[in-house]
Amino acid sequence: MKVFVLGWLLKINLMKTLYSQRRFYHVETPFNTNVGVGGRDIESTGFAWWSGNARLINVSGKLLGAHVAHAGIMVFWTGAMTLFEVAHFVPEKPLYEQGLILIPHLATLGWGVGPGGEIFNTYPYFVVGVVHLISSAVLGFGGLYHSLIGPDTLEESFPFFGYDWRDKNKMTTILGIHLVLLGIGAFLLVIKSLFVGGVYDTWAPGGGDVRFVSNPTLNPLVIFGYVLKSPFGGDGWIVSVNNMEDLIGGHVWIGIICIAGGIWHILTKPFAWARRAFVWSGEAYLSYSLGALSIMGLTASNFVWYNNTAYPSEFYGPTGPEASQAQAFTFLVRDQRLGANVASSQGPTGLGKYLMRSPSGEIIFGGETMRFWDLRAPWVEPLRGPNGLDLNKIKNDIQPWQERRAAEYMTHAPLGSLNSVGGVATEINSVNYVSPRSWLTTSHFFLGFFLFIGHLWHAGRARAAAAGFEKGINRENEPVLSMRPLD
């Protein structure tokens, strides 16, 4: 017996959504025999329960509830995980050896940390965790209220918060509000660094300290020079930022641009070319958002792997090149104490064993680490002169804190696999651990990549719907539909 004999074809024809008709075969299951949630079931929306928020495309109040509840889940994780890290924190060990990823971010903001990146007070982290937990409860209540009790749609009762996905002016107004909020977020970091206790600067003399960034770089040639730089080699695009003045100055510019752009989008209507160029539907906006998040994730992945200014090595562990250079430096210090002439000793290839010259003539560390000759790190920069490493400083001016830090970084390279088999292959003293730098890099690459796939998927569906053709497989003439049911 064909399925449409049962009358389901009529329901299919009556199912209209913003995008296109969906065909389905009705299945009664024990848990939903008597349950029908208007506006959120397959008959009225064309989407099954596993399509998630797609069921809420045309019920703005319920979609608000889903988003607020989702925010509550995220904030709850943040608070709970912060308290978990505080409970497991061991002051005698570096943060990066304890698998912590939230306390390092809070320490970078200058809370609870002193000279050399030493954590002396975990109470601020406890406060942050509790504040997030309380906030998550408020968000959770709001999510439940709007999902279960509040109005299905906001347009009638709260026109300011209501919307139609096809209303181009309203959509750009919402975009503008989001940009203003992002700009305010950027300025919060600026305010923290300028006026509220300062931030941790790994480049502060003597091995890093909390300080006020009182003179941020505002020169647009410097700030936008990062954006226009090549992403390859030693140029490093925006990832190459190596001082707090430029980093905070960049946030000043981003804050100004986001707020100005937000006000622009709130006050104006999209131009004719923009109305023609973009697809104006809920799924299209989802695809745009996923594309933007993908760029952010992939950028963050590169940033945390290579950059030791925004992500200080005291908290996140050394970068790969930093651990390699630290190994060469550690053995230079050891053998120099034993009487080796580090300036003239040759390695097995005839190149300098401890020191050598780069192709451009600068003095660099010799051996395998020569490929990382352009590394910049706070513990090695004081030993440089006008032409690379200064031989006089190498012989007479190496400080104990530099030796200690290099030895620590040498044995904590961010090369561990997920089962904690880690370290530099040539360093028998390496510690088996997964570096937070490795973890954050790989997780953000993974998330960025799959967000990009999601962007392509939803962009393709949105464009197909806008072009007016059916998506998916036409199942009308599928043989199985004419076969006898299994039961």
Swiss-Prot record:
Protein's UniProt keywords contain Transmembrane: yes
Binding site for [CaMn4O5] cluster: 381
Positions of the pro-segment in this chain: 1-28
Main location: plastid
Presence of keyword Amino-acid biosynthesis: no
Cofactor note: Binds multiple chlorophylls and provides some of the ligands for the Ca-4Mn-5O cluster of the oxygen-evolving complex. It may also provide a ligand for a Cl- that is required for oxygen evolution. PSII binds additional chlorophylls, carotenoids and specific lipids.
Matches recorded under NCBIfam families: psbC
Name recorded for this polypeptide: Photosystem II CP43 reaction center protein
Organism: Porphyra purpurea
